[in-house]
Amino acid sequence: GPGIIHHIWITTDNKTSEGDCFVLRDLVLRMYWDGEENPSVEAPLGDFFCCGFGKECYINSSLITVVPSRGLNSYIQMPFKKKAVITLENQHANAIPAFFYQIDYNLYNYLPEETEYFHASWRREALTELGKDYVIADGIKGSGHYIGTYIALSTLQRYWWGEGEVKFYIDGDEQYPTICGTGMEDYFGGSWSFAKHENGKTIEQTYTTPFLGYPYYSRHDDLVNNLYHNDDCPPMRGFYRWHVMDPVFFDEELKVTVQQIGVGHKGLFERQDDLSSVAYWYQKEPHNVFSKLPEKEKRWPR
């Protein structure tokens, strides 16, 4: 260094057998800047690239692009002053037959003293706590700006799931959020349940855009073909939102949460679902150590 990583391209298998089919959650991506001992980036490979159920999906956005067939691309700018170390830990049960990558970077004479470093952290609650907001990011101390959210949602209850407000608590705000949204589908740029109507049924429409998207919906395990059971799954939804044009700045600390609120025929109600997420942000070092990543079995989708 000094330098900036401008582009990362990765492709790999998504399963090694019918029984070992969550490669994208078993591979753990980590990034270290300037000799630090604790990673600034730690997430399952698929989730980092907004593919959170062990299955790739088409994404055409400004920061993350996923194209056929399983071409994982990041255009997130990643500066470093001395050196950058990127590792991939294989926690999968088997060797991965195919894994290819390319990292494109430039070296510079210097980077400004105020340069902030890229961070990303993964979390999951396999069953959210009733009446308690799901935490997307917490313990972020220092100055920086928040640039994005990815959420993988497996709904475990009936009816509409997306009324929970996304909240940002900035620089000491605790009792009330500094920024409070109007619902999860609104935060990801949609409205009115993403709905269209076909044959008397309401269908959610998926989409992918430069700054926000709902690229993945499925009720089926597309990775498994078994003659003795069907492929039904709890409904799975993947969303991303990039704060490129609307970054969320903080000087001291940041916390990001989302309510667990749905609505049915009798009105609003508190939900319990299976949520996992990746938070993406820049900050000056040092950063707080992330919570320990769960064992691979506890990362697998339902």
Give residue ranges: language-model regions.
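Beta-strand-centric surfaces of beta-sandwich/beta-rich domains
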Residues: 1-302
